């Protein structure tokens, strides 16, 4: 099974401020039943940003996956039991974890805020 991870850089200019999201490992091949961690780091001057994971499935449908901030995270109904996030505040990281991976998880995943 191939999980395609979207590679995105999002820049928001507010005067001289610049916010950025960086995803690494743009394409990953993952065996069904294993675990995958989709990496996302962000850079912002805001102390409690709203962070999101979205995905675009092979049929081009767009889906919300996960939301998080400094105190909580919440996933879409389909994420229950298999999807989670690792929000590491000190590293400004918001990684998506899928375990166990299923074929229906194949999609392009995007991290944003």
From Swiss-Prot:
The keyword Cell membrane applies. Keywords: Adaptive immunity, Cell membrane, Disulfide bond, Immunity, Immunoglobulin domain, Innate immunity, Membrane, Receptor, Signal, T cell receptor. It is found in: Cell membrane. The keyword Transit peptide does not apply. GO terms for biological process: adaptive immune response; immune response; innate immune response. Disulfide bonds join 40-111. SMART domains: IGv. Pfam families: V-set. GO terms for cellular component: immunoglobulin complex; T cell receptor complex. Its main location: membrane. Residues 19-113 form the Ig-like domain. Residues 1-18 form the signal peptide. PANTHER family: IG-LIKE DOMAIN-CONTAINING PROTEIN, T-CELL RECEPTOR ALPHA CHAIN V REGION. V region of the variable domain of T cell receptor (TR) delta chain that participates in the antigen recognition. Gamma-delta TRs recognize a variety of self and foreign non-peptide antigens frequently expressed at the epithelial boundaries between the host and external environment, including endogenous lipids presented by MH-like protein CD1D and phosphoantigens presented by butyrophilin-like molecule BTN3A1. Upon antigen recognition induces rapid, innate-like immune responses involved in pathogen clearance and tissue repair. Gamma-delta TR is a heterodimer composed of a gamma and delta chain; disulfide-linked. The gamma-delta TR is associated with the transmembrane signaling CD3 coreceptor proteins following the stoichiometry: a single gamma-delta TR heterodimer associates with one CD3D-CD3E heterodimer, one CD3G-CD3E heterodimer and one CD247 homodimer forming a stable octameric structure. Upon activation, gamma-delta TR complex associates with FCER1G to initiate intracellular signaling. This is T cell receptor delta variable 3. It comes from Homo sapiens.
């Amino acid at each position: 099974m191939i999980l395609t991870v979207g590679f995105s850089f999002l820049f928001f200019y507010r005067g001289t401020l610049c916010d950025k999201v960086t995803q690494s490992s743009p394409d990953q091949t993952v065996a069904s039943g294993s675990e995958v961690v989709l990496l996302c780091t962000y850079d912002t001057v805001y102390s409690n940003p709203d962070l999101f994971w979205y995905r675009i499935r092979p049929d081009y449908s767009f889906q919300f996956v996960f939301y998080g901030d400094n105190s909580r995270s919440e996933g879409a109904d389909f994420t229950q039991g298999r999807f989670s996030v690792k929000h590491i505040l000190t590293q400004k990281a918001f990684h998506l974890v899928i375990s166990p991976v299923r074929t229906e998880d194949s999609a392009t995943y995007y991290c944003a805020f």
